[in-house]
């Protein structure tokens, strides 16, 4: 198993940060909507303004065409109605002319001696199998037999039966669909009822568990209070015993022999020792004064050392400030030179663009654009 050390974790975090920054830079370069690097914002603004002007112009032209089309449709409807009225009037005039001036008795084939001769003649065909009904006579075509009406009636009856059958099948399908929906609804209701029962059971179980936990917590609190009371009572008894022992012991009675030790005269029992004599106190005071002088000397040396380091840090900070100001001055000069160079390049690109726009050129293909912006840098 590999063990991750802090150095590896720091290196991995640095690489992840670099990858994230590269992805952000690629999004700023390759994303057409959010790209802010490598683009001409002024040209984009001009394109957007031209596109809006084009859209407004096209919208006005479409509205003009639509108004003209509505006008033409209205004119066509008026002319169509006028033509229909003209045809009706012409047909009515023809019928009136035929009824007035083209009567049957004025025709050339009308026989004065037998006015009903045409009515007495045999029809063009007596039946569908008439011998006179030849092909050249053109008296019978497909669907023009004498049983056409009967066949038409049978077809209508058959269509009606089919329609009734389809309607019955549709009603049965609707009934089956309603039955399926009813069964589905009943199943959902059963599932909902079961879910509600389970939910009620869960709530009841949860309440029982909460009540049991609450009762257990109450018992724990009572037991804890009892233990605390017993501990406090035992502590009070111990304190009373200790106070009694101290009151009747050698410490408060100031017995000088109580501090004597079995290890020699220079050893004492600290819990019974009442203090030192004058010689011991003077020796301790002398040692303490020497320690004070030594500590003052060390503090003075440390202060002098700190002053030297402060002076060095001040000089170094002053030098760093001067160097930083020099660096900022150089950066401003470089930035000013870069701005001038960018301005001249922008002017050259603008002139080249105007020349390219003025000169005829072929439409670039997708292969031409795919060779640019293949990397983030």
Curated annotation (Swiss-Prot):
Keyword tags: Cell projection, Cilium, Coiled coil, Cytoplasm, Cytoskeleton, Flagellum
Residues forming coiled coils: 188-238
Primary location recorded for the protein, binned into one broad class: cytoplasm
PANTHER family attached to this UniProt entry: RIB43A-LIKE WITH COILED-COILS PROTEIN 2, RIB43A-RELATED
Protein name: RIB43A-like with coiled-coils protein 2
Family to which the UniProt record says this protein belongs: Belongs to the RIB43A family.
Primary role: Microtubule inner protein (MIP) part of the dynein-decorated doublet microtubules (DMTs) in cilia axoneme, which is required for motile cilia beating.
Region of interest: Disordered: 355-377
Cellular compartment(s): Cytoplasm, Cytoskeleton, Cilium axoneme; Cytoplasm, Cytoskeleton, Flagellum axoneme
This protein's GO CC annotations: axonemal A tubule inner sheath; axonemal microtubule; sperm flagellum
Polar residues composition bias: residue spans: 360-377
Gene Ontology terms describing biological process: flagellated sperm motility
Organism: Rattus norvegicus (Rat)
Keyword Acyltransferase recorded: no
Binding partners and assembly: Microtubule inner protein component of sperm flagellar doublet microtubules.
């Amino acid at each position: 198993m590999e063990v991750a050390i802090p150095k590896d974790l720091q290196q991995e975090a640095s690489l992840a940060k670099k990858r994230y920054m590269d992805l952000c830079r690629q999004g700023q370069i390759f994303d057409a909507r959010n790209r802010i690097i490598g683009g001409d914002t002024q040209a984009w603004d001009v394109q957007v303004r031209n596109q809006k002007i084009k859209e407004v112009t096209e919208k006005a032209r479409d509205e003009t065409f639509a108004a003209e089309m509505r006008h033409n449709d209205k004119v066509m409807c008026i002319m169509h109605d006028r033509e229909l009225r003209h045809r009706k009037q012409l047909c009515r005039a023809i019928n009136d002319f035929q009824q007035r001036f083209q009567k049957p008795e004025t025709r050339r084939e009308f026989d004065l001696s037998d006015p009903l001769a045409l009515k007495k003649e045999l029809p063009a065909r007596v039946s569908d199998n008439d011998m006179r009904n030849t092909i050249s006579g053109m008296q019978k075509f497909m669907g023009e037999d004498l049983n056409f009406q009967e066949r038409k009636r049978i077809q209508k009856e058959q269509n009606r039966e089919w329609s009734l059958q389809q309607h019955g099948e549709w009603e049965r399908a609707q009934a089956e669909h309603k039955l399926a929906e009813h069964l589905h609804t009943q199943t959902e209701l059963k599932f909902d009822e079961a879910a509600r029962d389970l939910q009620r059971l869960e709530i009841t179980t949860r309440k029982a568990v909460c009540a049991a936990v609450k009762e257990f917590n109450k018992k724990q609190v009572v037991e804890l209070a009892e233990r605390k009371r017993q501990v406090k009572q035992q502590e009070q008894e111990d304190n009373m015993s200790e106070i009694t022992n101290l009151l009747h012991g050698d410490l408060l009675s100031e017995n000088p022999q109580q501090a004597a030790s079995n290890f020699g005269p220079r050893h004492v029992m600290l819990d019974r020792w009442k203090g030192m004599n004058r010689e011991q106190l003077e020796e301790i005071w002398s040692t303490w004064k020497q320690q004070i002088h030594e500590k003052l000397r060390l503090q003075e040396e440390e202060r002098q050392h700190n002053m030297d380091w402060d002076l060095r840090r001040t000089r170094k900070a002053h030098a760093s400030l001067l160097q930083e100001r020099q660096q900022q001055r150089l950066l401003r000069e470089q930035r000013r030179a870069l701005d001038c160079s960018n301005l001249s390049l922008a002017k050259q690109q603008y002139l080249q663009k105007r020349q390219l726009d003025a000169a005829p050129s072929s439409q670039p293909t997708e292969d031409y654009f795919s060779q640019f912006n293949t990397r983030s840098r």
